[in-house]
Amino acid sequence: MIIIISGPPGSGKTSVAIKLANELSYKFISAGKIFRDIAQKMGLDIINLNKVAESNFDIDKMVDKKIFEFILSEKNLIIESHIAGWLFREYTNIAIYLWAPLKIRANRIAIRDKISYDQAISQIIKREYMHYKRFNKFYGIDINDLSVFDLVINTSNVDVNNIVKLILTYLSLVSQNPQPLKEKDINDK
Protein backbone atom coordinates (compact mmCIF):
# COMPACT_ATOMS: atom_id res chain seq x y z
CA MET A 1 0.00 0.00 0.00
CA ILE A 2 1.26 3.48 -0.85
CA ILE A 3 0.06 6.29 1.42
CA ILE A 4 0.55 10.02 0.96
CA ILE A 5 0.64 12.40 3.92
CA SER A 6 0.31 16.02 2.82
CA GLY A 7 -0.24 19.30 4.61
CA PRO A 8 1.14 22.77 5.22
CA PRO A 9 4.31 23.57 7.22
CA GLY A 10 3.86 22.76 10.92
CA SER A 11 0.82 20.54 10.44
CA GLY A 12 2.64 17.50 11.83
CA LYS A 13 2.91 15.64 8.54
CA THR A 14 6.54 14.58 9.00
CA SER A 15 6.09 13.39 12.59
CA VAL A 16 2.91 11.50 11.69
CA ALA A 17 4.38 10.02 8.49
CA ILE A 18 7.50 8.74 10.30
CA LYS A 19 5.46 7.21 13.13
CA LEU A 20 2.98 5.65 10.69
CA ALA A 21 5.81 4.21 8.58
CA ASN A 22 7.33 2.69 11.74
CA GLU A 23 3.98 1.25 12.87
CA LEU A 24 3.37 -0.35 9.47
CA SER A 25 7.04 -1.22 8.78
CA TYR A 26 6.80 0.77 5.53
CA LYS A 27 9.53 2.70 3.79
CA PHE A 28 9.37 6.46 4.44
CA ILE A 29 10.26 9.14 1.89
CA SER A 30 10.14 12.87 2.58
CA ALA A 31 9.85 15.43 -0.21
CA GLY A 32 10.87 18.03 2.36
CA LYS A 33 14.11 16.18 3.06
CA ILE A 34 14.85 15.87 -0.66
CA PHE A 35 14.19 19.61 -1.03
CA ARG A 36 16.38 20.45 2.00
CA ASP A 37 19.18 18.26 0.60
CA ILE A 38 19.00 20.20 -2.68
CA ALA A 39 19.07 23.48 -0.73
CA GLN A 40 22.13 22.34 1.21
CA LYS A 41 23.95 21.29 -1.96
CA MET A 42 23.20 24.71 -3.45
CA GLY A 43 24.23 26.53 -0.24
CA LEU A 44 20.72 27.96 0.29
CA ASP A 45 18.10 27.89 3.02
CA ILE A 46 14.54 26.68 2.35
CA ILE A 47 13.09 30.16 1.78
CA ASN A 48 15.76 31.08 -0.76
CA LEU A 49 15.50 27.75 -2.58
CA ASN A 50 11.73 28.30 -2.77
CA LYS A 51 12.46 31.69 -4.37
CA VAL A 52 14.79 30.06 -6.91
CA ALA A 53 12.20 27.33 -7.57
CA GLU A 54 9.60 29.99 -8.46
CA SER A 55 11.44 30.55 -11.74
CA ASN A 56 13.30 27.24 -12.10
CA PHE A 57 10.87 24.33 -12.48
CA ASP A 58 13.81 21.89 -12.64
CA ILE A 59 14.12 21.96 -8.84
CA ASP A 60 10.57 20.69 -8.31
CA LYS A 61 10.99 18.19 -11.15
CA MET A 62 14.05 16.72 -9.36
CA VAL A 63 11.98 16.18 -6.21
CA ASP A 64 9.02 14.78 -8.19
CA LYS A 65 11.25 12.39 -10.14
CA LYS A 66 12.81 11.02 -6.96
CA ILE A 67 9.39 10.45 -5.36
CA PHE A 68 8.03 8.80 -8.51
CA GLU A 69 11.02 6.43 -8.58
CA PHE A 70 10.06 5.30 -5.06
CA ILE A 71 6.41 4.88 -6.09
CA LEU A 72 7.48 2.61 -8.94
CA SER A 73 9.92 0.56 -6.86
CA GLU A 74 8.21 0.19 -3.46
CA LYS A 75 5.05 -1.72 -2.56
CA ASN A 76 4.72 -0.38 0.98
CA LEU A 77 5.54 3.29 1.16
CA ILE A 78 4.66 6.42 3.13
CA ILE A 79 5.27 9.64 1.18
CA GLU A 80 5.43 12.92 3.11
CA SER A 81 5.00 15.88 0.78
CA HIS A 82 3.22 19.20 0.42
CA ILE A 83 1.82 18.37 -3.03
CA ALA A 84 2.09 14.60 -3.57
CA GLY A 85 -1.64 14.23 -2.92
CA TRP A 86 -2.36 16.21 -6.06
CA LEU A 87 0.56 15.00 -8.19
CA PHE A 88 0.66 11.28 -7.50
CA ARG A 89 -2.88 10.47 -6.33
CA GLU A 90 -3.59 8.11 -9.22
CA TYR A 91 -0.52 5.99 -8.33
CA THR A 92 -1.28 5.63 -4.63
CA ASN A 93 -3.87 3.94 -2.44
CA ILE A 94 -4.63 6.54 0.22
CA ALA A 95 -4.05 10.30 0.45
CA ILE A 96 -4.28 12.04 3.83
CA TYR A 97 -4.15 15.78 4.48
CA LEU A 98 -3.12 17.12 7.89
CA TRP A 99 -3.72 20.72 8.89
CA ALA A 100 -3.87 23.01 11.91
CA PRO A 101 -4.54 26.72 12.38
CA LEU A 102 -1.66 29.09 11.58
CA LYS A 103 -1.01 30.05 15.23
CA ILE A 104 -0.62 26.43 16.28
CA ARG A 105 1.63 25.60 13.33
CA ALA A 106 3.77 28.69 14.03
CA ASN A 107 4.15 27.67 17.66
CA ARG A 108 5.23 24.16 16.64
CA ILE A 109 7.78 25.49 14.15
CA ALA A 110 9.11 28.04 16.66
CA ILE A 111 9.74 25.26 19.19
CA ARG A 112 11.13 22.81 16.61
CA ASP A 113 13.46 25.28 14.89
CA LYS A 114 14.30 27.28 18.05
CA ILE A 115 13.14 30.56 16.51
CA SER A 116 10.74 33.21 17.72
CA TYR A 117 7.02 32.85 17.19
CA ASP A 118 7.05 35.96 14.96
CA GLN A 119 9.84 34.48 12.83
CA ALA A 120 7.86 31.25 12.50
CA ILE A 121 4.71 33.14 11.41
CA SER A 122 6.71 35.10 8.86
CA GLN A 123 8.41 31.95 7.56
CA ILE A 124 5.11 30.07 7.19
CA ILE A 125 3.38 32.93 5.39
CA LYS A 126 6.29 33.33 2.96
CA ARG A 127 6.54 29.60 2.28
CA GLU A 128 2.81 29.13 1.81
CA TYR A 129 2.58 32.11 -0.53
CA MET A 130 5.52 30.81 -2.58
CA HIS A 131 4.05 27.30 -2.63
CA TYR A 132 0.64 28.55 -3.72
CA LYS A 133 2.07 30.62 -6.57
CA ARG A 134 4.58 28.00 -7.69
CA PHE A 135 2.31 24.97 -7.54
CA ASN A 136 -0.42 26.84 -9.39
CA LYS A 137 1.99 28.18 -12.03
CA PHE A 138 3.86 24.95 -12.78
CA TYR A 139 1.27 22.27 -11.97
CA GLY A 140 -2.08 24.06 -12.18
CA ILE A 141 -2.76 22.89 -8.62
CA ASP A 142 -4.98 24.81 -6.22
CA ILE A 143 -3.59 23.74 -2.85
CA ASN A 144 -6.83 24.87 -1.21
CA ASP A 145 -8.79 22.15 -3.05
CA LEU A 146 -8.68 19.15 -0.73
CA SER A 147 -11.10 17.01 -2.76
CA VAL A 148 -8.29 14.64 -3.84
CA PHE A 149 -7.77 13.47 -0.24
CA ASP A 150 -9.45 10.48 1.37
CA LEU A 151 -9.01 11.79 4.89
CA VAL A 152 -8.47 15.32 6.24
CA ILE A 153 -7.41 15.67 9.89
CA ASN A 154 -7.17 18.77 12.07
CA THR A 155 -4.06 18.04 14.16
CA SER A 156 -4.39 20.98 16.54
CA ASN A 157 -5.90 19.07 19.48
CA VAL A 158 -4.62 15.55 18.83
CA ASP A 159 -1.13 14.23 19.52
CA VAL A 160 0.94 12.27 17.01
CA ASN A 161 0.19 8.87 18.57
CA ASN A 162 -3.56 9.40 18.41
CA ILE A 163 -3.41 10.77 14.86
CA VAL A 164 -1.59 7.59 13.84
CA LYS A 165 -4.23 5.49 15.65
CA LEU A 166 -6.94 7.39 13.76
CA ILE A 167 -5.20 6.73 10.44
CA LEU A 168 -4.71 3.04 11.26
CA THR A 169 -8.42 2.79 12.11
CA TYR A 170 -9.28 4.45 8.81
CA LEU A 171 -6.96 2.08 6.91
CA SER A 172 -8.62 -0.88 8.61
CA LEU A 173 -12.09 0.36 7.65
CA VAL A 174 -11.04 1.03 4.06
CA SER A 175 -9.48 -2.42 3.71
CA GLN A 176 -12.83 -3.96 4.77
CA ASN A 177 -14.57 -2.18 1.87
CA PRO A 178 -11.93 -1.76 -0.84
CA GLN A 179 -14.39 -1.18 -3.70
CA PRO A 180 -15.92 2.28 -4.01
CA LEU A 181 -19.72 2.38 -4.12
CA LYS A 182 -21.14 2.76 -7.59
CA GLU A 183 -23.66 5.51 -8.27
CA LYS A 184 -26.36 2.85 -8.79
CA ASP A 185 -25.60 1.36 -5.34
CA ILE A 186 -25.92 4.79 -3.72
CA ASN A 187 -29.23 5.53 -5.46
CA ASP A 188 -30.65 2.13 -4.44
CA LYS A 189 -30.09 2.80 -0.74
From Swiss-Prot:
Gene Ontology molecular function, alphabetical: ATP binding; CMP kinase activity; dCMP kinase activity
Keywords of the record: ATP-binding, Cytoplasm, Kinase, Nucleotide-binding, Transferase
ATP-binding keyword on record: yes
Gene Ontology CC annotations of this record: cytoplasm
InterPro entries: Cyt_kin_arch, Cytidylate_kinase_dom, P-loop_NTPase
Biological process according to GO: pyrimidine nucleotide metabolic process
Amino acids binding ATP: 7-15
The keyword Cytoplasm belongs to this UniProt entry's keyword annotation: yes
EC id: 2.7.4.25
Catalysed conversion reaction: CMP + ATP = CDP + ADP; dCMP + ATP = dCDP + ADP
Record localization: Cytoplasm
Family note: Belongs to the cytidylate kinase family. Type 2 subfamily.
Name assigned to this protein: Cytidylate kinase
Biological source species: Saccharolobus islandicus (strain Y.G.57.14 / Yellowstone #1) (Sulfolobus islandicus)
